[in-house]
Each structure stands twice: as C-alpha cells, then as structure tokens.
Amino acid sequence: MARVKRAVNAHKKRRVILERAKGYRGQRSRLYRKAKEQLLHSFVYSYGDRRKRKGDFRRLWIQRINAASRANGLTYNRLIQGLKAASIEVDRRMLSELAVNDAAAFAGLVKLAKAALPADTSAPVAN
C-alpha cells in the first residue's frame, strides 16, 4: 500500500485556524493550539450571546417605552395594563419604535390605555 503524506492537509488545517483567529491578542492569534482553544471558546460565546441578544433588546424596548409613557403621565406597568384592557395588541418592539419615532401616535395609545384603565386611586402616578 502506498504511503500517504498529510503535510499539505495539516498545513491547510492550521492555516485556516490561524486565519480565523486574526485579531485576537498575543499567542491566541499566532500559536495554533492557543488559537484553536480560543476559537472554540469564541463559538461558545457567539452561541450564547445570540440568545442573550433577544433579552437585551427586550430590556431596551421596555426602558424606552417606560421613559416615553412617563413623559405622558403613565408608568410602563399601567400602560401595558391599560393596553390589554383596551384590547390593543401591540408588542414592545412596535411600542418602542412608536415612542422613539412617532411621539404623537404613542401619545394616542397612552390616551387609549388611560381611558381603558379602571379608576384606581391607589395606583402610582408618574411624575
């Protein structure tokens, strides 16, 4: 049986790993073993952060909605409660877009939510 030399494959494999590790600091971009370890960790971080990003955006939307609704005299909690009572199905992403880009439309939604809320004197009032 003929002898198979694998130098070409090995060099290509190492070159691909080192090319993907460009931009890393120190040995992590220069030495094959360190670069390979760092790439494996990078893939794990990427996977986890793609899922984390969804929660990050939801938190951002809620902060924007809360700020805009407080400017209109209602807390975030009461706004969501009022929108549900008024049977208005608008998700937080759309609400935050309205709050940032179309303040008049957002104010209209706040007005509808206020009208749908039960008259509760113990509810907190936004400053």
UniProtKB/Swiss-Prot annotation:
Task: Spell out the molecular function terms from Gene Ontology.
Answer: rRNA binding; structural constituent of ribosome
Family annotation (PROSITE patterns):
RIBOSOMAL_L20
Q: Which GO terms describe its biological process?
A: ribosomal large subunit assembly; translation
Which superkingdom is the protein from? Bacteria
An example of a Pfam family matching this protein is: Ribosomal_L20
**Gene3D superfamilies cross-referenced by the UniProt entry:** 6.10.160.10, Ribosomal protein L20
Query: Where do the TM regions start and end?
Result: none
Similarity comment text for this entry: Belongs to the bacterial ribosomal protein bL20 family.
Q: Mind telling me what this protein is named? A: Large ribosomal subunit protein bL20
Could you tell me which species this protein originates from? Renibacterium salmoninarum (strain ATCC 33209 / DSM 20767 / JCM 11484 / NBRC 15589 / NCIMB 2235)
Organismal lineage: Bacteria, Bacillati, Actinomycetota, Actinomycetes, Micrococcales
Gene that produces this protein = rplT
